[in-house]
């Protein structure tokens, strides 16, 4: 059963069509991998799903009904870089999220453990590595236990161990009932993580298939981005 469906989502900035009639389907408890070169429209689509941007036309459905502003608490997201207060600690940043989302502070330690971010409670975000900031951003997205998790390039700044931990975390989350949309520039990583894969190019969804790990995704991607894919 589909958890979330976008129906003919379109968006223009000034005179440029950034998204053109995008139709994607995120199934329950699965990972949807979104691929595309810089400027293809991936982040714009994710921002629309999260309610950060409004589409010009089209509709989003959640659990087979039109999605409204009241449903946005069901969506957790990490879009681009985490929005943090760099003079505060990870715990204090999460307390602010908890206050905004009406979440009990008791969830903080468990979500930090979940993303394997065990740091000195006095350590400020300004002293975090890029990978640590990414882990915190994922924790901030997860603290309200969303039904849908939207992650834009979550492996940025992670070392190989961190990427492996991310894989294990996403697997655990889907087993617990979370549906996930993830974007990446790393084709091989999407092919490992995703149940379905979509490729956006020049604002259009050029490819959408169930993940076939035997398929040459790199060849398909380069044919699409060069305009040779049929």
Residue map of PLM features:
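Conserved ABC ATPase "signature" region
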Residues: 95, 99, 105-120
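Catalytic Walker B motif of ABC-type/P-loop ATPase nucleotide-binding domains
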Residues: 149-153
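Conserved structural motif at the start of ABC-family nucleotide-binding domains
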Residues: 4-6, 19-21
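Helix-to-loop junction immediately C-terminal to a conserved catalytic motif
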Residues: 50
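Conserved ABC transporter NBD signature motif
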Residues: 58-73, 207-209
């Amino acid at each position: 059963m589909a958890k979330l469906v976008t129906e003919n989502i379109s968006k223009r900035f000034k005179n440029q069509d950034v998204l053109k009639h995008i139709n994607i389907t995120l199934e329950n408890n699965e990972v949807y991998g979104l691929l595309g070169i810089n400027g293809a429209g991936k982040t714009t689509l994710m921002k629309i799903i999260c309610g950060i941007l409004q589409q010009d036309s089209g509709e989003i459905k959640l659990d087979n009904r039109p999605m409204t502003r009241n449903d946005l608490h069901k969506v957790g997201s990490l879009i681009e870089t985490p929005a943090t207060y760099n003079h505060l600690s990870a715990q204090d940043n999460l307390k602010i999220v908890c206050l905004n989302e009406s979440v009990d502070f008791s969830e903080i330690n468990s979500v930090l453990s979940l993303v394997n971010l065990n740091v000195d409670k006095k350590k400020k975000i300004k002293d975090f590595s890029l990978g640590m900031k990414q882990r915190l951003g994922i924790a901030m997205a997860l603290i309200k236990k969303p039904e849908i998790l939207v992650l834009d390039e979550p492996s940025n700044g992670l070392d190989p161990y961190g990427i492996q931990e991310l894989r294990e975390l996403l697997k655990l989350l889907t087993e617990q009932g979370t549906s996930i949309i993830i974007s990446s520039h790393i084709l091989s990583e999407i092919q490992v993580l995703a149940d379905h894969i979509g490729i956006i190019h020049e604002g259009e969804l050029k490819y959408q298939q169930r993940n076939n790990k035997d398929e040459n995704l790199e060849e398909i991607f380069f044919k699409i981005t060069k305009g040779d894919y049929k």
